[in-house]
Structure formats: C-alpha cells, structure tokens
C-alpha cells in the first residue's frame, strides 16, 4: 500500500492522486458488508457515485491539460507526444493497485482488531513492523541505489524532510487504528478523503498541476459527496436507534 502510493505520486499529479484515493471508499463500504454484515443505503451509494464521478472529471481535466501542453510545443514530433501522454499510464496502474491494497488493509485491520482486541498502540506497532520488510525488499529491487542518486536524494534537506514525515506517519498510524476501532472502515476512509481534498486544492495553487475548470469541479464534487455521506450516516444512526427502541418494546 505504501509503495504503490509512492509510485502513484511519481507519475500522477497531486490533485489526481488525491481524488483517485476516494475510489477506495466504495471497495471498503461493500467490503464491510461482506466482512461484517449490514447494508449500504441509497444515500451512501449516491455519495460514492459522486466520488467516482469526481475522479472521472479529474482524469478528463488531466488529459485535457496534457493535450494542450503537447499541442503548444513547437516542432513536436509524434514520439515526444506519445512519451508525454504515456507518463500517465503507469500512474493509473499503480493507483488501481493502491486502491485494492488500501481497501484490504483497512478491512483486515478492523477484522484483526475485533478478533484480537488490539489496543491502538498495538495496531500502530504491528502495522509498521510488518510493512518494513516488504518496503525494504521492493526498495532494493525497484529503486536506483547508485551513488549519484543517493547524493541527490540524501541531502540534509531531504533527510530532515524524511524525519519529519516519519514522525507524522507515526501519529497518522496511531490515529488511523483508533478511528477504525471506534467508528468503521468506511467512515475512516471518507474522513481521509475529505482531508485530502484541501491538499488537492493546494496542489493546484502551489504545485505545477493542471489548472482548468474540470480540475476545480472534480474537487467540488468530492466535497459535496463527503457532505452527502455525513448526512447519510447520521440518518442511518437515527434509524438504528429507532429500530433498537422498537425492539425493546
């Protein structure tokens, strides 16, 4: 999950990456039905469809920006155009793999917390310890470990950023385990999706990400779907309370 996330960011623009992460919510929602029972309400399903639509709109905006950029270059041959557009293709493949692995990770984590009665610290510890060997293996096999590359990527600024990122990751891991334990996998993923939308907007403002109507509209749809899910969740909780009160009578 962590490795495919990094590879996705290597090829995809920040807004596209963050919007596509929302596709995982649908997999998790129906995965919870299979793992834990229950159902997905029509309003929840509508919010998921809107999230998918936001991802599709984001893709259109990304492709549109690439086409405009390619057509504006002078003396551009066909090979350069194909190489420019191809940069997106492996990114989408990595993103699809990341969606599947992320959904399985959250569902299995909640299942394991229930079975073993893990505390939040235990969840954080085992998540990171089990992931470390796989990350090391893939890093040695797939990445460039030449002296030149190490000198560029292991500068003082890069090391400081890695340390800060690592410390923040510890906090994220702990809070993730806590959120999954006290709420649900779907709610955890939806909150995470809403957290990423401001980052997607920041990518449009501060980074060299494609800026067009479709990019901004996709972010708007993402926010709207998150609000709709929150309303759907509140209604679902109220219905469960009414049903429980009826059964008690």
UniProtKB/Swiss-Prot annotation:
Glycosylation sites: 149, 153
Protein's UniProt keywords contain S-adenosyl-L-methionine: no
Listed GO CC annotations: cytoplasmic vesicle membrane; endoplasmic reticulum; endoplasmic reticulum membrane; Golgi apparatus; Golgi membrane
Highest rank taxon of the organism: Eukaryota
Topology feature Lumenal, residues: 1-15, 69-84, 144-159, 208-211
Function: Involved in the import of GDP-mannose from the cytoplasm into the Golgi lumen.
InterPro entries: SCL35B1-4/HUT1, TPT_transporter
Cellular localisation: Golgi apparatus membrane; Cytoplasmic vesicle membrane; Endoplasmic reticulum membrane
Gene Ontology molecular-function annotations: antiporter activity; GDP-mannose transmembrane transporter activity
Transmembrane segments: 16-36, 48-68, 85-105, 123-143, 160-180, 187-207, 212-232
Taxonomic lineage of the native organism: Eukaryota, Fungi, Dikarya, Ascomycota, Saccharomycotina
Pfam hit, one: UAA
Family affiliation: Belongs to the TPT transporter family. SLC35D subfamily.
Topology relative to the membrane: Multi-pass membrane protein
Protein keywords: Cytoplasmic vesicle, Endoplasmic reticulum, Glycoprotein, Golgi apparatus, Membrane, Sugar transport, Transmembrane, Transmembrane helix, Transport
Keyword Membrane: yes
Gene Ontology terms: biological process: GDP-mannose transmembrane transport
Segments in the Cytoplasmic topological domain: 37-47, 106-122, 181-186, 233-249
This protein's name: Probable GDP-mannose transporter 2
């Amino acid at each position: 999950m962590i490795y495919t996330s990094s590879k996705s960011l290597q090829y995809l623009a920040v807004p596209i990456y963050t919007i596509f992460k929302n596709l995982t919510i649908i997999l998790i929602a129906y995965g919870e039905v299979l793992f834990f029972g229950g159902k997905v309400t029509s309003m929840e399903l509508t919010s998921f469809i809107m999230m998918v639509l936001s991802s599709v709109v984001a893709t259109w905006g990304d492709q549109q920006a690439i086409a405009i950029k390619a057509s504006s270059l002078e003396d551009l041959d066909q090979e350069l155009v194909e190489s420019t557009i191809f940069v997106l293709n492996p990114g989408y493949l990595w993103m699809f793999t990341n969606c599947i692995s992320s959904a399985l990770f959250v569902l299995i984590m909640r299942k394991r917390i229930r079975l073993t009665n893990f505390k939040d610290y235990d969840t954080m510890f085992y998540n990171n310890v089990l992931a470390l060997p796989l990350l090391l293996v893939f890093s040695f096999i797939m990445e460039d470990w030449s002296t030149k590359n190490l000198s560029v990527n292991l500068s003082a600024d890069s090391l400081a950023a890695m340390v800060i990122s690592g410390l923040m990751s510890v906090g994220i891991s702990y809070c993730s385990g806590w959120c999954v334990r006290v709420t649900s996998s779907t709610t955890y993923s939806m909150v995470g999706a809403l957290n990423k939308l401001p980052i997607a907007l920041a990518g449009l403002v501060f980074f060299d990400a494609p800026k067009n109507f479709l990019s901004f509209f996709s972010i708007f749809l993402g926010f709207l779907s998150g609000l709709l899910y929150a309303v759907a969740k509140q209604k679902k909780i109220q219905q469960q309370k009414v049903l429980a009160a009826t059964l008690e009578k």
